[in-house]
A protein has these predicted regions:
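FAD-binding core/adjacent interface of flavoenzyme oxidoreductases
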Residues: 1-9, 24-25, 37, 80-122
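N-terminal Rossmann-like dinucleotide/flavin-binding domain of flavoprotein oxidoreductases
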Residues: 43-105
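Short N-terminal binding/cap micro-motifs at the start of the first secondary-structure element
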Residues: 15-16, 38-41
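Glycine-rich Rossmann-fold phosphate-binding loop(s) that bind the pyrophosphate
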Residues: 10-14
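Conserved catalytic-core motifs of eukaryotic protein kinase domains, centered on the activation segment
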Residues: 42-43, 122
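Short beta-strand "acidic-cap" motif of Rossmann-like dinucleotide-binding folds
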Residues: 27-34, 42
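Gly/Ala-rich phosphate-binding loop of Rossmann-like dinucleotide-binding domains
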Residues: 19, 23
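Generic beta-structure capping elements
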Residues: 34, 45-48, 116
Length: 122
């Protein structure tokens, strides 16, 4: 079982930004995503489409946004569990036990769901 300060479900922009912020305050985290690569919808569906709603960035593409977020994470040791889907989330006292379809188990006090509106499966 993997023990971590936080488990982020979703490796799209919100999940990546959340991982960055957690590491900045000294918390360890792991990220699980059903897709086989980092970036979520931005990289999977519209890597070349302009995005206009990121604060302080007037315009960027999905690929640029993803690459910038990945570059910001490089100084940190973040483990990504790609091509893995969360199958079970269960409360155990003050912790959560999270299990994936590949049999990976996590124990954490914090589960952050960053699946976004573009999640491909319920």
């Amino acid at each position: 079982m993997i023990k971590t300060d936080a488990l982020i479900i979703g490796a799209g922009p919100t999940g990546l930004f959340t991982a960055h912020q957690l590491k900045l305050i000294g918390l360890n985290c792991e990220v699980v995503d059903n897709l086989d690569k980092i970036g979520g919808q931005c990289i999977e569906l519209y890597p070349d489409k302009p995005i206009y709603d990121i604060p302080a960035i007037p315009e960027c593409t999905g690929e640029e946004l993803t690459n910038n977020l990945i570059n910001q994470l490089k100084p940190f040791d973040i483990k990504f569990h790609l091509s893995e889907r969360v199958d079970e989330v269960k409360k155990d006292g003050d912790k959560w036990i999270v299990k994936t379809n590949k049999g990976t188990s996590f124990i954490t006090p914090n589960v952050i769901i960053a699946g976004g509106v573009g999640s491909f499966e319920p």
